[in-house]
């Protein structure tokens, strides 16, 4: 593996070739570049970072048998390149059969009640099974499922079944299901053409809100409660927080943000530290968080509007509310929030620190900025909920349509030549993954922590909270996630094995635009691994890869 450090290099000749290719593509709209962004000093040739942050997928849930797909007749076929490197997958670990979740009696008969002894083993989900149950992905439940690193109690602690289904799909053993390249075809194609990590984790255990905060701040401590009906989390009655042991609180589960008019005001919280948006604003670098459903003035085709805008998904057979407040990274911070969902004053103002929208936008605004050539330096993207992959209300096929449409659009712009797209997820949803990271940040809450025994997650040092003192509630690394980089500068058909986490994203932003400035206040950006090994800035640039949103196949 040729791991290269970030370095500034000349790239005008190569970029010109990419613009020429884009202009020659028939039917592709080509818009102006973003001149203000392009002249910013960066440590790499990357002038634009787009972070597509989807929901609730473990690495093995999507890549258990990569790069080998079953290729069942009638499904989009996937055939890997001959030189595809090996990844740390279920199949490579020889855990598709005789899995420890089958042999551990602690999972009980519930996991096996329909499908015999096979139910505790991993099993393939096909395209007709795209709609699944939402698994238990709470902080404590995930620790219990990983069972001291043995990863053998998933059906017992995180598994849920689909009522009315048959076989393992109807039981808690559904948590052992995985897709292959016949369903998540686009992601497998991106992994073939660009770069992927098989060693990316959440920074702590737990669901969406902790993951969202880690992606922008690397810190879940320093939570302030604005209103709550709940007590600190226990095994019997989980809640969104624990006492941190220093007189404050650490957020460990989902809760709506204080600074959002769409939040459930009975339970809302805010964060007291800094996030990456604060650093970018201080440096006058354009950025934005773009979320499906954020524009409350829009009326959807089904007549819904405001906070309850929704979209019908035939796959999950439901109307799904587009915007979910507890997924909104920046609404937990007074400095980067837009409580009233105020619209930007113009497309030209998108990304600006002086506009009333305060960097919080609808996903449609991102497309408008692309079309206008006003592409922010840093963009965080959240799809409408029906397309964000979250089991229970979304699915991998709706996700693929949204994801591929967005990536195709970015690749058609001249700014593609200086863009990196990161695709990753906020948490694992509790889906089985065989890889258990060694704990590097311990926690000893008497109730919430159960990984190494009652009241214990690891045996080492507690990480620092916002005050600089060691705190509870930040046990990790947590669960393993897909993490892909799509860019002209991504390594080709490459798998990086260096440990990274969600906090590696703000670290990259800091290294590329902010001269290595860190957030401070105990943020994991200091210790998070670098994503440098996913790039090669000295190789010829990668061409864009256009895919069919419906099938994930390459567009000929």
Where are these regions (language model features)?
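N-terminal secretory signal peptides that target proteins for export/translocation
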Residues: 1-11
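A periodicity- and composition-biased signal for non-globular, repetitive helical segments
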Residues: 10, 19-20, 133, 513
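Bacterial N-terminal signal peptides
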Residues: 16-27
């Amino acid at each position: 593996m040729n791991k290269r450090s970030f370095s500034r290099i000349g790239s005008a000749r190569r970029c010109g070739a990419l613009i020429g290719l884009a202009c020659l593509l028939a039917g592709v709209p080509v818009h102006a570049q973003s001149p203000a962004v392009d002249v910013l000093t960066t440590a790499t040739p990357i002038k634009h970072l787009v972070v597509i942050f989807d929901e609730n997928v473990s690495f093995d849930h999507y890549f258990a048998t990569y790069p080998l797909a079953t290729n069942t007749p009638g499904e989009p076929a996937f055939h890997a390149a001959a030189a595809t490197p090996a990844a740390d997958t279920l199949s490579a670990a020889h855990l598709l059969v005789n899995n420890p979740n089958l042999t551990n009696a602690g999972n009980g008969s519930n996991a096996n009640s329909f499908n015999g002894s096979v139910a505790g083993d991993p099993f393939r989900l096909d395209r007709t099974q795209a709609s699944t149950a939402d698994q238990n992905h709470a902080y404590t439940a995930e620790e219990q499922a990983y069972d001291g690193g043995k990863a053998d109690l998933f059906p017992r602690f995180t598994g849920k079944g689909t009522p009315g289904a048959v076989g393992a799909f109807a039981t808690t053993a559904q948590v052992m299901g995985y897709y292959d390249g016949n369903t998540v075809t686009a992601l497998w194609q991106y992994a073939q053409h660009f770069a992927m990590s098989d060693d990316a984790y959440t920074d702590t255990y737990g669901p969406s809100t902790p993951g969202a905060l880690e992606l922008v701040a690397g810190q879940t401590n320093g939570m302030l409660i604005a209103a709550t009906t709940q007590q600190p989390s226990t095994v019997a009655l989980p809640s969104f927080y624990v006492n941190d042991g220093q007189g404050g609180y650490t957020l460990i589960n989902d809760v709506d943000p204080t600074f959002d008019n769409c939040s459930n005001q009975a339970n809302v919280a805010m964060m007291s530290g800094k996030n990456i948006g604060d650093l970018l604003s201080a440096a006058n670098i354009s950025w934005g968080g773009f979320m499906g459903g954020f524009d409350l003035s829009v009326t959807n085709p089904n007549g819904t509007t405001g906070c309850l805008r929704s979209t019908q998904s035939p796959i999950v057979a439901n109307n799904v509310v587009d915007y979910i407040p507890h997924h909104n990274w920046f609404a937990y911070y007074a400095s980067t929030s837009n409580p009233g969902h105020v619209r930007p004053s113009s497309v030209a103002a998108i990304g600006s620190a002086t506009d009333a929208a305060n960097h919080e936008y609808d996903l449609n605004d991102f497309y408008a900025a692309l079309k206008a050539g006003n592409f922010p330096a840093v963009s965080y993207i959240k799809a409408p909920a029906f397309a964000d992959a979250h089991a229970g209300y979304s699915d991998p096929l709706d996700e693929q349509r949204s994801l591929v449409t967005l990536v195709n659009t970015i690749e058609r712009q001249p700014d593609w030549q200086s863009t990196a797209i990161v695709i990753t997820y906020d948490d694992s949803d509790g889906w089985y993954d065989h890889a258990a990271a060694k704990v590097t940040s311990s926690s000893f809450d008497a109730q919430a922590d159960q990984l190494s025994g009652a009241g214990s997650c690891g045996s080492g040092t507690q990480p620092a909270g916002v005050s600089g003192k060691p705190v509870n509630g930040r046990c990790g690394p947590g669960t393993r996630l897909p993490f892909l980089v799509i860019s002209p500068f991504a390594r080709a058909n490459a798998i990086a094995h260096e440990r990274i986490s969600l906090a590696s994203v703000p670290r990259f932003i800091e290294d590329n635009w902010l001269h290595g400035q860190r957030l401070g206040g105990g943020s994991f950006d200091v210790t998070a691994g670098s994503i440098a090994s996913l790039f090669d800035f000295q190789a010829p640039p990668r061409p864009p890869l256009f895919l069919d949103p419906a099938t994930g196949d390459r567009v000929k």
